[in-house]
Amino acid sequence: MASASLISEPSFSAYWGGSGGFANQTVVDKVPPEMLYLVDPHWYQFPPMNPLWHGLLGFVIGVLGVISVIGNGMVIYIFSTTKSLRTPSNLLVVNLAFSDFLMMFTMSAPMGINCYYETWVLGPFMCELYALFGSLFGCGSIWTMTMIALDRYNVIVKGLSAKPMTNKTAMLRILFIWAFSVAWTIMPLFGWNRYVPEGNMTACGTDYLTKDWVSRSYILVYSFFVYLLPLGTIIYSYFFILQAVSAHEKQMREQRKKMNVASLRSAEASQTSAECKLAKVALMTISLWFFGWTPYLIINFTGIFETMKISPLLTIWGSLFAKANAVFNPIVYGISHPKYRAALEKKFPSLACASSSDDNTSVASGATTVSDEKSEKSASA
C-alpha cells in the first residue's frame, strides 16, 4: 500500500511516465513563475532530475551542515576560551572556522528545503542572498588560508629575523579579508554578472552561461582575485616553507653525524618541529579546500568557454564539493592538533579524541612561540 502511494506521487509518475522516462517535462517546470526570469534558456533542454538525486542531495547537505556547524562552532569556542590558544596566529584559525560555520549555517537549511520541493521555492531575493553568502564565505575562507600561509612563511622561512604578528596586525588582516570579500561578492547585485539558479534548481550561484562579456569578465576577474591569486600565493609560501624545512633537516642530520649522537633536539629544534607540524596541517587544509572548490571553478569556466555541455546533475557535484569544504577544517584540527584535543577533552570529555602523550608540544603553541618570543624581545628592547 505504501509503495503504491509512493509510486503515485507526481514526481515519481512524471519521472517514469512518457518516452525515456519523462512525459515531455523539463527541469524548469517546477520553478515558480517569479523565478523564471533568472533561469537561463540552457536548462530548458534537460528533463527533470530523478527525485532520488534531490533526496540524496538534501540528506547529504543536511548531514554536512550539522557536522560543520557543530565542528566549527567547537573550534571557535575552544580557541576563544583556551588561554594558551589565544594567540595572534590562531585568530586566523578562528576566522577560518567562523567563515566555514556561517557558510553552512546560512546555506544548508535553504538547500534542504529546496531539495524537498525539488526546485527553488524561496523567491528571487533569497536566491541572490544565498548565492552571495556562498561567494562571500568561500572568498573569506580562501583568503584566510592565504593569510595563514603567509604567517607560516614569515615564521618558518624568515625565522627570528621576521617581524612577529601581533593581535593588531592579525585583526587588520581579518578586516582586509572581509572588506575584500564583501567588495567582490556584492558586484553582481549592481549589474556586473548576476546571481541565478543552478542547473539543479535547488541552489543559486554566479551566472556562467550568459554570453556577453560583462558577465564573462566578472567570472574571469573574480576567479583570478579570489582563486588563482591566493592559490599562487599559497603555493609560493609553501614552496619556500618546504625548502626551509628540508634545509633544516639536512643541517640536523649533518650535526648529528658530526657529534656522533643518535638524537639531537635543542629547544630551538623542538620549536621548529612544531612549526613543521603546523605547516603540514595547514597544507592539508588548503589541499582539501583546493579539491573542494576547483570543481565549481571548472563548471564556471566550462560555462563561459562552452567547452562541454553542463547538465543539472553536474552542477549538484560542484555545489556539494564546495560546501563539503566547510566540514574539513574542524576534522583536520581535531585529528592533528594536540593542544586542541587536550582542550576538547577537558571541555567535552564525551566527544574528545584520545589525548596524546605529546600535548605539551602543541602545534598551535609551537607555531606561535617564535612570534611570542620575538614580541617579548622587542618589548624589552
Curated annotation (Swiss-Prot):
Residues recorded as bearing N6-(retinylidene)lysine in the entry: 323
Record's comment on post-translational modification: Phosphorylated on some or all of the serine and threonine residues present in the C-terminal region.
Name recorded for this polypeptide: Opsin-1
Source species taxonomy: Eukaryota, Metazoa, Ecdysozoa, Arthropoda, Hexapoda
Biased composition annotated in UniProt, kind: Polar residues: 354-370
A GO term, aspect molecular function: G protein-coupled receptor activity
GO biological process per UniProt: phototransduction; visual perception
PANTHER family named among the record's database cross-references: OPSIN
SMART domains (alphabetical): 7TM_GPCR_Srsx
